[in-house]
Amino acid sequence: VESDGEHKDTFDLKGRALMPLIDAARILSLSKGIKNVANTISRYSKLAELEPQNAPVYEACADAFAELLKFRTEEGLKNENDGRYLNLSELSKLDKVKLKNDFQPINDIQEVIKNKFQLTYFT
């Protein structure tokens, strides 16, 4: 939740949830030489094909990304803006649980990246 500024007390959905998933998909796709795949969900699908040992993580990331995009779209339509900032106090209890659950795949994909690129010195 943003602590100050214009978006105080809102959650930066793009910066704190979507971008980590987007960036992870890009990094991993580049490392595998995946080309001509232009969106995040397709990148995770291709990664799942190429790395069956990590397929559950990639599939969970694709699902979380789709759910987060849904939150952003609904927020944008409701407030006639880009939906980047989510007012958590307006979410139903179920939506809060869904949002919270969408962060586990982010943690999991970050672990995959740390292991794949041996980034243990940065933790």
Write out the residue ranges for each language-model feature.
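Conserved nucleotidyltransferase catalytic core and NTase-mimicking acidic/glycine-rich helix/loop elements
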Residues: 1-123
